[in-house]
């Protein structure tokens, strides 16, 4: 059985790119998803992004090679918020 991964991102207005605000695997990933649901934070499932971002340091800016895929994720979130 595959272990779930979750990565929470924060994108401050003046930042060059989003930052990793939380990372979890297994039960920790489930907790991140639970907190997101409790606070009506949109969740986007993207296994490739989760694999790459889940090994980054919490508080670090996302790697430049992930900017395009993360931009696509944020695009989905913005569309969701406009609904």
What are these model-derived regions, one by one?
Residues 1-83:
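Divalent-cation
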């Amino acid at each position: 059985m595959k272990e779930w991964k979750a990565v929470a991102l924060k994108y401050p207005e003046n930042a060059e790119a989003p930052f990793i605000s939380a990372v979890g695997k297994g039960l920790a990933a489930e907790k991140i998803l639970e907190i997101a649901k409790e606070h009506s934070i949109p969740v986007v499932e993207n296994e490739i992004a989760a694999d790459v971002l889940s090994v980054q340091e919490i508080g670090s800016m996302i790697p430049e090679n992930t900017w395009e895929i993360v931009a696509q994720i944020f695009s989905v979130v913005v569309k969701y918020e406009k609904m």
